[in-house]
Regions:
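Sequence/structural segment immediately N-terminal to covalent heme-attachment motifs in c-type
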Residues: 39-62, 96-97
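Hydrophobic h-region of N-terminal signal peptides that target proteins for export
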Residues: 9-17
């Protein structure tokens, strides 16, 4: 029984570390945000964030939302360099495809809405 418990814990650890090393494909880096620095798009993104994202990622994007407290791994802190240093295309790919507890939005948000959300996520940069 101890053996199965140890194997289970190891597998959980591997899954958690796989979530932490989330890398978009190289091709995503080159995708350009057509709404970059568009204030109206950013405002629309803010409204979507309040509807879809804040419960896990928090009102200030620090990964401390009420629904995210019990998640493993924790939701991303959007103000950190590990997020902000990625290209818009990489963030768009991750938002579109999801992973683990992060659901894919490519079926529920159109491309314009996803770019608008990326614009708003950029406002969390320290």
């Amino acid at each position: 029984m101890k053996f199965l418990t140890i194997i289970g814990l190891l597998l959980c650890g591997l899954l958690t570390s796989a979530q932490d090393n989330w890398v978009a494909p190289e091709s995503a880096k080159e995708v350009v945000n057509v709404y970059s620095e568009n204030d109206i798009a950013t405002q629309k993104g803010a409204k979507m964030y309040q509807k879809l994202c804040w419960t896990c990622h928090g009102k200030t994007g620090q990964g401390n939302g009420p629904a995210g407290s019990g998640l493993k791994p924790k939701p991303r802190n959007f103000s950190l360099g590990e997020v902000q240093d990625q290209s818009d295309g990489e963030l768009f790919w991750k938002l579109s495809n999801g992973k683990g507890m992060m659901i894919p939005y490519k079926h529920s948000l159109n491309e314009d809405q996803r770019w608008q959300l990326i614009n708003f996520i950029r406002t969390f940069k320290k």
